[in-house]
């Protein structure tokens, strides 16, 4: 898109122009989806991340204030959301591991008693 055309397009998005949102989705979904799949290694997770970005933009178009290059901004937004997703997954994985370790430690004396018999 030419810079002037992109400014007009962003203005239409901020004004919640439905046709502009449809065009935004058509122009960028597949590119953003491929980026997300590459980052999170999961198709469903990637799809959810990208779809949520589009929903958030529709609900709060003010996020587009100051955006000059829409494609670059969208890619950065997807990247940030993917990194956040991976961070949350890492925390959940660590929590699960700690839980399993606690269970194993709680069961350890019973196992030791069985082995001594």
What are these language model-derived features?
Residues 1-8:
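Extreme N-terminal regulatory/targeting segments of RNA polymerase sigma factors
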């Amino acid at each position: 898109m030419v810079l002037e055309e992109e400014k007009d397009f962003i203005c239409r998005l901020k004004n919640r122009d439905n046709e502009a949102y449809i065009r935004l989705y058509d122009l960028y979904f597949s590119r953003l989806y491929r980026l997300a799949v590459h980052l999170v290694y999961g198709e469903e997770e990637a799809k959810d991340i990208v779809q949520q970005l589009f929903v958030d933009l529709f609900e709060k178009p003010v996020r587009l204030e100051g955006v000059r290059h829409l494609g670059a901004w969208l890619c950065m937004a997807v990247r940030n959301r993917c990194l956040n997703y991976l961070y949350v997954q890492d925390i959940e994985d660590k929590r699960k591991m700690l839980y399993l370790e606690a269970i194993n430690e709680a069961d350890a004396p019973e196992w030791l008693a069985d082995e001594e018999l």
